[in-house]
From Swiss-Prot:
It comes from Neisseria gonorrhoeae (strain NCCP11945). One of its GO terms (cellular component) is cytosol. It comes from the Bacteria. It catalyses: uroporphyrinogen III + 4 H(+) = coproporphyrinogen III + 4 CO2. Catalyzes the decarboxylation of four acetate groups of uroporphyrinogen-III to yield coproporphyrinogen-III. This is Uroporphyrinogen decarboxylase. The keyword Transport does not apply. It holds the Pfam family URO-D.
């Protein structure tokens, strides 16, 4: 494999010295970029784009051509895993993802099993293709949804505002939910390890919906299964450590518990104070975040002010990867994203070295 020309992102995740704070953006390959929209139109549908190795590679690389980012992230979707389990993923126009065969009967759940990873070969082919296209420019991040977040879509049959179906199952038939979560945890572990084998140099677990749970439920139905995955991941590849990032949206309450799961870094959403978060986790993990995606709708001056505030909040030393507190909004101005990236590089040098 090609030698990495820029490994700042990987070093920051391992709290090793860096010259500046690295940055990438969740959903950096996405609808805010006109070139992404053009490629997506060429592909036909979102799922076709995910499954076309050449086009998935193209959209992964697009933001790196425009911005001086320190990492690329595989272009895919968290719902590829339940789709491979036979749930029939489709995207309804203007409604987001849906499953044709949601898990709403005990008999469906009894039949649920870890999918054959060959059904996800298109994802691993994309990882290998992207690594080749990157040619050592920056590291490539692989990812998956968390067991609970995947279960939300699998049980609800799509997105939800109140998660009534899955919460009903959680409180009335927890045995059924345990079965789904355990299957998901095994599947995600195999899926991420296959991404690492294909060339992913770091992996992120997205727990988008963990924050809708009570304190006890988060620990029992989400964190426990993320810990299971982290324990089963390959942590070395190509002669270097493969860092693991866990991002739980709305998870700021549980940082102390999340430190215990064995990840190298925790992602923060924009509601957290990053300085307080650093004090709470001590030197145990790196932190990633946590610029409010909506702040990109501000002026160039307000974007610079917000970047400075976050960098000052984190303070001196390594262990910070700059990111948004959630995915970039589809209406964001790419020029404002460029200001964000360049400002992070410019203003962060004073916090490193010397």
């Amino acid at each position: 494999m090609t030698l990495l020309k820029n490994d700042t992102f990987l070093r920051a995740l391992l709290k090793q010295p860096v010259e500046y704070t690295p940055i990438w953006m969740m959903r950096q390959a996405g609808r805010y970029l006109p070139e992404y929209k053009a490629t997506r139109a060429k592909a036909g549908s979102f799922l076709d784009l995910c499954k076309n190795t050449g086009l998935a590679t193209e959209v992964t690389i697009q933001p790196l051509e425009r911005f001086d980012l320190d990492a690329a992230i595989l272009f895919s979707d968290i719902l590829t895993v339940p789709d491979a389990m036979g749930l029939g993923l489709y995207f309804a126009e203007g409604e987001g993802p849906k499953f044709a065969h949601a898990l709403q009967h005990e008999s469906d759940i009894a039949k649920l099993h870890v999918p054959d990873m060959e059904k996800l070969q298109y994802v691993f082919d994309a990882v290998t293709s992207i690594r080749k296209a990157l040619d050592g420019r920056v590291p490539l991040i692989g990812f998956s949804g968390s067991p609970f977040t995947l279960a939300c879509y699998m049980v609800e049959g799509g997105g939800s505002k109140e998660f009534r179906t899955i919460k009903t199952m959680m409180y009335s038939r927890p045995d059924l939910l345990y079965k789904i979560l355990d299957t998901n945890a095994q599947a995600v572990t195999a899926y991420l390890n296959a991404q690492i084998d294909a060339g992913a140099q770091a992996v992120q677990i997205f727990d988008t919906w963990g924050g809708v749970l009570s304190d006890a439920a988060f620990k029992e139905f989400s964190l426990k299964y993320i810990r299971q995955i982290v324990a089963g991941l390959k942590r070395e590849s190509e002669g270097r450590r493969v860092p693991v990032i866990v991002f739980a949206k709305g998870g700021g309450l549980w940082l102390e518990s999340m430190v215990q799961i064995g990840a190298d870094a925790l992602g923060l959403d924009w509601t957290c104070n990053i300085g307080e978060a650093r004090r709470r986790v001590g030197n145990q993990v790196a932190l990633q975040g946590n610029f409010d995606p909506s702040a990109l709708f501000g002026t160039p001056e307000s974007i610079r002010t917000e970047v400075a505030r976050i960098l000052t909040g984190y303070g001196h030393g390594s262990g910070h990867v700059f990111n948004l507190g959630h995915g970039i909004n589809q209406h964001a101005d790419p020029e404002h994203a460029k200001i964000l990236v360049d400002t992070v590089h410019e203003l962060s040098r004073q916090y490193h070295g010397g």
